[in-house]
Amino acid sequence: MKPSVILYKALPDDLLQRLQAHFTVHQVANLSPQTVVQNAAIFAEAEGLLGSNENVDAALLEKMPKLRATSTISVGYDNFDVDALTARKILLMHTPTVLTETVADTLMALVLSTARRVVEVAERVKAGEWTASIGPDWYGTDVHHKTLGIVGMGRIGMALAQRVHFGFNMPILYNARRHHKEAEERFNARYCDLDTLLQESDFVCLILPLTDETHHLFGAEQFAKMKSSAIFINAGRGPVVDENALIAALQKGEIHAAGLDVFEQEPLSVDSPLLSMANVVAVPHIGSATHETRYGMAACAVDNLIDALQGKVEKNCVNPHVAD
């Protein structure tokens, strides 16, 4: 008999068939308590779990005594109780490599659109305000040769560094838990403490996961240290930033503009002051949202679950020591 797995995110037909070739697949709409109660027998027998954008916590795991592996269609896993999974020797798989280039593209788009005011001036054109040759009130700022600070020099940070170094001749500062020799050799990136990065960068790009240590890492103190001409970019996780402090910094002119793909609460409230600011580019967590990349992430997650339930955890596993 094939192992039983629960799928809580729709998959393309070919990927669903790949999953079904290895497992008995039960599809549910979500992981809400109501769904779990209504499908109690299925959850009780499931050895695998695959999907995204749902919380997997200790309460859910109590209902899944046979669970051996869970696979998320994402690189981030802050919605998983990793300690609870590890305590129960349940593997957690994710998709860290598939989306690197696409998210770096999104970061670059935010850098360019904020500096050159692309969204703002496009809306002015649509509103019929372009009635003569444009003047300084339409101008943006240059990107090339400006200093870019990267907070979090992982795969995505490296991909962004490659773009700005070779494409825009930008000096790069970075702050991370450790020195990144490859970034320094390939892109002439300079490691520095966070305060120095904030004080010297024209663009500050935040690419950090959400952990207890990074929650509200950026607040009023950090924004106050940035140049008043600086542009802040966040495409990591929303709660790494104290959003109220960001709003205040923008309102007071402590920073020039912001390009945001992530927020403390998602979807962003329609009442958020960020939405009324012309110098803010706010997009709905589109970092990896292309047809090609989302398919690749789903395919990776399927393969990850197959590997995990076959005892193969050489890659893409958050807690591989569970398999020891």
UniProtKB/Swiss-Prot annotation:
EC number(s) per entry: 1.1.1.79, 1.1.1.81
GO CC entries: cytosol; plasma membrane
The keyword Oxidoreductase is annotated on this UniProt entry: yes
Pfam families: 2-Hacid_dh, 2-Hacid_dh_C
Localization per Swiss-Prot or TrEMBL: Cytoplasm
Keyword Oxidoreductase found: yes
Role description: Catalyzes the NADPH-dependent reduction of glyoxylate and hydroxypyruvate into glycolate and glycerate, respectively.
Family listed: Belongs to the D-isomer specific 2-hydroxyacid dehydrogenase family. GhrB subfamily.
Protein name: Glyoxylate/hydroxypyruvate reductase B
Species this protein is from: Shigella flexneri
